[in-house]
Amino acid sequence: PARYASTRFPAKPLAMLGGKTVIQRVYEQVTGVLDDAYVATDDERIEAAVKAFGGKVVMTSVDHKSGTDRCYEACTKIGGDFDVIVNIQGDEPFIQPSQLNAVKACFEDSTTQIATLVKPFTADEPFAVLENVNSPKVVVNKNWNALYFSRSIIPYQRNADREDWLKGHTYYKHIGLYAYRTEVLREITALPQSSLELAESLEQLRWLENGYKIKVGISEVETIGIDTPQDLKHAEEFLKNRS
């Protein structure tokens, strides 16, 4: 999914990053790893840009409240007999094949309904990174199913100094990559928004609140999502250093 009217960074899929648009970089990262790839958008400018670099694109409604809803509409328009639909945010230009394979591997368990990824925070990261509300945290159970996602720091360590929290517990940062069994995608998009979802502005809480299980895979790869113009600057620096 890639929409034009982002509140924090309008037109970000069309922002230039190292001579290519952000959406082209995302598309090039995922083709070859999945059986098929489409950009689902609500804007003719994005549609034209995708066609210009030879990508596949599907026009969807401007009224969707989430990327998951947009994915489902695109899925119904594309048709085909897909077992699993992978939802890759259109602002993740450095998504890696290893991450896509990790989320695909979650479906080797026949009971998996929905899957996503996390990355462990490291003990040497500054506490401000853990506090960042734009980087949701995840807690999981023994079977690596998500218990909860929050913009707050979870868990709260009652008997430890805050500066020692990352040393005393492994915290997990959510990576905004989802995959769903096709029939589950149909079901969850029919659900009304939930109270937890509205409180945290995290759509995955709707699924948990309605009893769906979210299998969690681990990635050690750092991702750089483009949410703000400042993020784009960081991405440009990352790209220069990598090359």
Model-flagged regions — what are they?
Residues P1-T41:
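N-terminal glycine-rich phosphate-binding loop and ensuing alpha1 helix
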Residues L34, G80-F82, D109-Q113, Y212:
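Short, high-confidence coil segments that cap the C-terminus of an alpha-helix
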Residues Y38, E44-A102:
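Short phosphate-binding loop-to-helix
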Residues T41-D42, I95, Y180, D227:
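A conserved hydrophobic position in a structured secondary element of the catalytic/binding core
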Residues G80, W165-S243:
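Conserved alpha/beta core of the MobA/IspD/sugar-nucleotide pyrophosphorylase nucleotidyltransferase superfamily
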Residues Q96-I188:
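Conserved core of the sugar-phosphate nucleotidyltransferase
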